[in-house]
């Protein structure tokens, strides 16, 4: 097509004389010549591999590529939607039950042990409903917009992103806490640490407590929620833990009793001359050589700064012991 246009322009440029009918008749008569020249050019281009032939063929090849290129998924979706709209066809919407089955199947194939629970939590997040609603309304249809959002979340979870990061929250000591990538997700095992400290704090005792390497602030905030007369300093050195901890302090309305201090371990409290009755911490304790052996959910997404405890896993414990001598009340 490009060559025909090219040859036609060149030949017809010499036929500008005479009236309109004369020019029209002459151009019709020249069509066989245009076709013949174009045919010979095509044959020559097919056999030649020099720069001139490539230059002449380039526009035509690009035009061919543009007109014959297969559409991507997004273009296909638009085309199908336009066709269905033109035909007055309304696409079927899947039900809650169908989407739960699809999501669970996808997660199970990726070896996600909690595939049923996770599929329910993710669909509930999209719809703003709890699990009981999903279970009792399995036949209710879900909009295509919500279905697309749900499947995007399923895709994230299938890549082993922790469900807590996707949901943006977790439960610890019976309380809800905001979490996001960049802070360690509080573990159920850590509740033992909180319970042990609560056991040695009287209900009405006024104490100053330090939650060191605070992460999400879950430990210190849980202590403050269970003991109304204590004050807590949440300490971490990184920006995301600072943001998340402050968010959780506000979430639980503890601004008057819980504060955040950005510090490398106890460096700032020492400078400020602060003293604490209790220092609690769940610092990084995994040996550096063992990080790559952790589950994908952990090693691919959770911050290594909250996991890596150095060569023997005890580097932070030694520092905390030494610095605590300068900040603990005797």
Name each model feature, range by range.
Residues 4-28, 35, 39:
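Juxtamembrane "helix exit" motif at the C-terminal ends of alpha-helical transmembrane segments
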Residues 122, 160, 190, 219, ...:
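Residue-level signal for inorganic ion chemistry
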Residues 189-293:
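Conserved SAM/SAH cofactor-binding pocket of Class I
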